[in-house]
């Protein structure tokens, strides 16, 4: 039976490159002169530190533009709350989502079941496997999911006959 997997993966090397480009741009931009704004990367997250909320928004805009230029979807980012930091500064943690959560997996399965396509979907760890009798149904499921806005970056991989 033909099948494919729905995954949500982000290339962390591209994230690292985007963060480095954003750091370089912030260090060279005129509107950030004298500012202590900084971006640091952790394992699966990016920490942004800025003087105030306005500068924080500007730093995040720079970071998002670099992500888009490197073909990293903004949907893969989850923004933490803005917290105060020492010296009157503000900090925000932006986590990079890897894998599909159980809730999103259930949402994807519900969308597929509502469509009445002749396919079955099941959650496997951090991905969703979709199987069907013929390839046309599977391609219909892919088109259906691409058309829906599920607030998650999806890739369709491992298409098998």
From Swiss-Prot:
The keyword Manganese does not apply. GO terms for cellular component: cytosol. It comes from the Bacteria. Transmembrane segments: none annotated. Keywords: Nucleotide-binding. Pfam families: DUF520. GO terms for molecular function: nucleotide binding. InterPro entries: DUF520, UPF0234-like_C, UPF0234_N, YajQ-like_sf. The keyword Metal-binding does not apply. Belongs to the YajQ family. Nucleotide-binding protein. PANTHER family: UPF0234 PROTEIN YAJQ. NCBIfam families: PRK05412.1 (NF003819). This is Nucleotide-binding protein Ppro_3093. It comes from Pelobacter propionicus (strain DSM 2379 / NBRC 103807 / OttBd1).
């Amino acid at each position: 039976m033909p099948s494919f997997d729905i995954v949500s993966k982000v290339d962390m090397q591209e994230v690292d490159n985007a963060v480095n480009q954003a750091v370089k741009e912030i260090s060279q931009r005129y509107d950030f002169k004298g500012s202590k704004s900084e971006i640091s990367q952790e394992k699966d997250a990016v920490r942004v530190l800025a003087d105030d909320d306005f500068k924080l928004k500007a730093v995040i805009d720079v970071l998002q533009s670099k992500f888009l230029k490197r073909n990293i979807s903004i949907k893969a980012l989850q923004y933490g709350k803005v917290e105060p930091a020492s010296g009157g500064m503000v900090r925000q943690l932006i986590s990079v989502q890897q894998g599909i959560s159980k809730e999103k997996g259930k949402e994807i399965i519900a969308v597929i079941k509502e469509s009445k396509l002749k396919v079955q979907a099941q959650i496997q760890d951090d991905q969703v496997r979709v199987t069907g009798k013929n390839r046309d149904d599977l391609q219909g499921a892919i088109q259906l999911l691409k058309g829906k806005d599920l607030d998650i970056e999806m890739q369709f991989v491992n298409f098998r006959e």
